[in-house]
Amino acid sequence: MMCAVTVRQIKPDSYEDFRKAWEPDPWLPKLRNALVLRNEDNPDQVLTIGFFDAGPEQLDTVRDDPAVLAGEDKRLRRIAEFEERVVLNGIFELVEDVKDPAER
């Protein structure tokens, strides 16, 4: 599983608009689900994580698709209106899913 992780500082009081702009449309191939988290101490700092049912090579193939590139370009332009800066952006491979031992 691969994860797209981004932390953004968004403009004050823009969360609802940011959230609408952020939503992938169309939904990305191999994207299983996504999480949107807000910093408790700074609600204008938003962490997004997209979980892809793909290995590194499969995700590269998806990301290189011209239709996906065009859709992501549109989405990022929508987001930019509400974004002050990107704090962190990267693709991470899930290497462990650690669970409570009592739930194993």
Please place each PLM-identified region on the residue numbering:
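Coil-to-beta-strand transition motifs
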Residues: 1, 29, 43-44
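Active-site-flanking beta-strand signature of metal-NTP-handling nucleotidyl enzymes
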Residues: 2-8, 47-49
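Short, surface-exposed ligand-recognition loops at beta-strand->loop->(often short) alpha-helix junctions
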Residues: 7-19
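Non-catalytic surface loops within mature trypsin-like serine protease
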Residues: 10-12, 53-54, 93-96
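Short, surface-exposed coil-to-beta transition loops
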Residues: 19, 31-33, 45-47
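An amphipathic, aromatic/His-enriched active-site/gating alpha helix that lines ligand/cofactor pockets
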Residues: 23-35, 52-88
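A short beta-turn/loop motif at secondary-structure boundaries
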Residues: 37-43
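Short, low-order "capping/linker" segments at domain edges
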Residues: 88-104
